[in-house]
Amino acid sequence: MTEITFKGGPIHLKGQQINEGDFAPDFTVLDNDLNQVTLADYAGKKKLISVVPSIDTGVCDQQTRKFNSDASKEEGIVLTISADLPFAQKRWCASAGLDNVITLSDHRDLSFGENYGVVMEELRLLARAVFVLDADNKVVYKEIVSEGTDFPDFDAALAAYKNI
């Protein structure tokens, strides 16, 4: 998919598209304390990567809470990645009262977005998406939501995560 809609308008996605069965490419993002983080930092663990346009919106907030509460019951790790500033992500985590949420910022280089094909070119934000990776970083599930203001398929993503 190289085009989605956002609030009904067409948006072009840029970056390298990856598919189920591919090995996930590396990326460099920032944590809430401005430390660089890469995919290799989570080696040997299955991962649910929840991608949101902005943590401060209602749909993104609910998506982050849902994956955090449901997927965190499983062994593995849940990452939420957006192009928000790390400070905004840290503030959101504090105001949401969620201590164990891992939010990562792709604002600086859009490394994650470019490597996973989810940069909304017109907005310089990340498209809503979910990637599930096994412990060897093989993509076992991928969804790029066709309308950026809709929720992802929680059931399908969580089933893929639980069945690894």
Curated annotation (Swiss-Prot):
It catalyses: a hydroperoxide + [thioredoxin]-dithiol = an alcohol + [thioredoxin]-disulfide + H2O. Residues 18-163 form the Thioredoxin domain. It is an enzyme of class 1 (oxidoreductase). One of its GO terms (molecular function) is thioredoxin peroxidase activity. The active site is at residue 60. SUPFAM superfamilies: Thioredoxin-like. Disulfide bonds join 60-93. Keywords: Antioxidant, Disulfide bond, Oxidoreductase, Peroxidase, Redox-active center. InterPro entries: Redoxin (IPR013740), Thioredoxin-like_sf (IPR036249), Thioredoxin_domain (IPR013766), TPX (IPR002065), Tpx_CS (IPR018219), Tpx_Peroxidase_subfamily (IPR050455). Its EC number is 1.11.1.24. Belongs to the peroxiredoxin family. Tpx subfamily. Thiol-specific peroxidase that catalyzes the reduction of hydrogen peroxide and organic hydroperoxides to water and alcohols, respectively. Plays a role in cell protection against oxidative stress by detoxifying peroxides. Homodimer. The active site is a conserved redox-active cysteine residue, the peroxidatic cysteine (C(P)), which makes the nucleophilic attack on the peroxide substrate. The peroxide oxidizes the C(P)-SH to cysteine sulfenic acid (C(P)-SOH), which then reacts with another cysteine residue, the resolving cysteine (C(R)), to form a disulfide bridge. The disulfide is subsequently reduced by an appropriate electron donor to complete the catalytic cycle. In this atypical 2-Cys peroxiredoxin, C(R) is present in the same subunit to form an intramolecular disulfide. This is Thiol peroxidase. It comes from Staphylococcus aureus (strain COL).
